[in-house]
From Swiss-Prot:
Bilayer topology term: Multi-pass membrane protein
Extracellular side: 44-54, 102-113
Record's keyword annotation contains Transmembrane: yes
Name used for this protein in its record: High osmolarity signaling protein SHO1
Domain of life: Eukaryota
Positions on the Cytoplasmic side per record topology: 1-22, 76-80, 135-293
Species: Verticillium alfalfae (strain VaMs.102 / ATCC MYA-4576 / FGSC 10136) (Verticillium wilt of alfalfa)
SMART domains membership: SH3
Length: 293
């Protein structure tokens, strides 16, 4: 499992993820400009008035860390990995900004007013980021914002845009092991349900006697049971693709689809959904490429 995660999740930073996303580019630029205004104005206010609260310096340090973290997360396409931590720090920053602004925004001196303007801009950006990073990818506001991202339409991004640590093992990609009693499995070689995981194997020459004594068939399953679990027959949900996606050629379980294509979905509880196209093709699709109708 760790090998598959490394295979899907190791990616470097790509400036195209920031430049090709209007929301990311605009919000990061405004945040950097607001921080510079607040920093310079705070220095001037501290020198001229000596009334600037010490909380301002803590906020400036916190804000530069948050802006840098947001830039890194978007550039490396690891939003799904770090969005909880980002939302927590942005909430903390917005709370402390509110306390600071309550103490300086009503000061009529020019340096304080300039500093207040910078901190107000930072507050607005923090509030927008809290909504964006705190929302699920399928949420309508976030899906609408993401629809303008040019980089997510590229071929390379379609193949590599994952959840940071790679696609988790789901029931569609890994078949669960069949449950038998110890008497039924005595003397059998138990094949691993996950490729690459070795299990202890019993001698093969003991399998024939146990087949006859327990009534288990030669395929290792009781009579009347199928060898594999088939795909679901009901697809109660409908979803619209907000990006195009090209299935990984090394994973036969994935399904390709184009932007704005309508898919039928059987289960929406996981990060990868079992879907069916209008052509009848079935497979799993990443949930952050789809929005429920």
């Amino acid at each position: 499992m760790e090998h598959s995660r490394a295979q899907y999740g190791r990616r470097g930073m790509n400036m195209g993820n920031v430049i090709g996303d209007p929301f990311a580019l605009a919000s990061i630029s405004i945040a950097m400009l607001a921080w510079v205004i607040a920093f310079i104005s705070s220095i001037v206010a501290a020198v001229q008035t000596n009334d600037l609260p010490n909380l301002a310096w803590w906020i400036l340090a916190l804000e530069v860390g948050i802006v840098g973290a947001v830039f890194f997360v978007i550039a490396s396409d690891t939003i799904q990995t770090y969005h909880v931590a980002l939302t927590a720090y942005q909430t903390l920053a917005l709370a402390t900004l509110s306390i600071l602004l309550n103490r300086i925004v009503y000061d009529g001196r020019g340096a304080m007013q300039a500093a207040s303007a910078g901190y107000v801009l930072l507050s607005v950006v923090m509030a927008l980021w809290m909504i964006y990073f705190g929302s699920a990818p399928s949420a309508s506001p976030r899906a609408y914002v993401d629809s303008f991202a040019l980089q997510k339409e590229g071929h390379g991004s379609r193949n590599t845009m994952t959840y940071g640590t790679g696609r988790p093992e789901t029931s569609t990609s890994v078949q669960p092991p069949q449950m038998y009693t110890s008497a039924q499995l005595n003397g059998f070689e138990n094949p691993s349900p996950v490729g690459g995981i070795s299990q202890s194997q019993a001698p093969r020459n003991s399998a024939v006697p146990n087949l006859n004594s327990t009534g288990v068939t030669a395929n290792g399953k009781p009579p009347g049971q199928d060898q594999e679990v088939g795909p679901p027959t009901e697809y109660p949900y409908r979803a619209k693709a907000i990006y195009s996606y090209e299935a990984n050629p090394e994973d036969a379980n994935e399904i390709s689809f184009s932007k704005h294509e309508i898919l039928e979905v059987s289960d929406v509880s996981g990060r990868w959904w079992q879907a069916r196209k209008e052509s009848g093709d079935t497979g799993i699709a990443p949930s952050n490429y789809l929005i429920l109708l």
